[in-house]
Amino acid sequence: MDGNSTHPAPNLKTTMAWSRISNQLGHWNDRKVIAIPLSDFLNTHPDIQSGIIAEFKKATGEEGMFARDPESLGIMLLGPVKLFKPDSVVVDGNLFWDPKGIHASAPKEQQKKAKIPRPPNAYILYRKDHHREIREQNPGLHNNEISVIVGNMWRDEQPHIREKYFNMSNEIKTRLLLENPDYRYNPRRSQDIRRRVSPYLKIKLLNYDVNGNLLWGTVNAEDAALIRTHFHGVVRVEEMDDGCRIVCRPVAGSRKLRAAVVDTWMPRYTVDTTPVTEDDDAQAFNFNDPLGGAYFPLNEHLWITVNQNPPFNAPPPNPNPHLDFVHPDGMEAVVHNVQNMIAQVQEANEAAALTLPPPPPLRLLSLRLWLMIPLTQLSFPL
């Protein structure tokens, strides 16, 4: 048999070898790196390896080389020369690279520059100096409460102390601009900022009984921390494998949580330590209701409707959409809404009174009936 037919030409072997690995150069492979089994690479003739390098240059337009992958010892990498570190041992005319523990890295022009932190302003420096002191004096305070205290201190601080921190802030900013002349502050766009959901809304998504009282609910760790902060002492957080279980504390906590989901403009709730009485059990909510005892017609604009039992596990009724979580117009707008609701109730009652049939007219007793009544049962004013 002819030798040429028994042993194919090297260029044909190169084409066959390249066709088996070239399908890895898809649009998803932006690094242009091909993975080759180490056993196949070791069984490949050096001339075929050189041919594969040439085919790689034709396909990508860049000089290629082989490199050992330290993360997977059974894999050989084929990629651009600039992708691999130049201080490694290179043999066989730049065809093979064995870093012995050093793996490929992205080119310097593709590496993302480290983000330069924004220089702190005067208040941030002031807060940094006083935060630890406030925490040591009040170990139970939340960071938000500490920020309020430090903010009041900064507002009432002496002018020379404030000027000191303003000078410190200007020095830090000047030093940063000298070290990074190209620095520009680029704030995040509004659509890129993750919106924080109100803890009252998260409480609404939990499970309630037919009377609107919180039973239990499962949320993630982040939501559990938010609920624990705003409803401290009212709920109990139990950590589980699939999340955190929110359980309402007995009696007072359940009433206050029901008030929270109905009146979302009300402030943060804490545990009510007063003993429970029969009057408290009879009340629907544990706060002063300006419309207590009034008759409510079925009106979607009112906070509450009566004689409607929600299904099991249904959330409480939605509050007035004009109130939102914190009413933008303050307490005056809330009082105005309450007055409007009272007026609506009065108008509804007056309209119902007009539709009732008139009472029968008063008729005088006939003389015959008068004669039938004994005189002893009649009484006349003197």
Swiss-Prot record:
Which keywords appear in this protein's UniProt record, sorted alphabetically?
DNA-binding, Nucleus, Transcription, Transcription regulation
Return the Gene3D superfamilies for the record.
High mobility group box domain
Q: Name one GO cellular component term.
A: nucleus
Subcellular location(s): the record lists: Nucleus
One of the record's GO molecular function terms = DNA-binding transcription activator activity, RNA polymerase II-specific
Q: Which SUPFAM superfamilies match?
A: HMG-box (SSF47095)
Which SMART domains does this chain map to? HMG (SM00398)
Its quaternary structure? Binds in vitro to DNA containing a specific core sequence 5'-CTTTG-3'.
| Protein's UniProt name | Mating-type protein a-1
Coding gene? mta-1
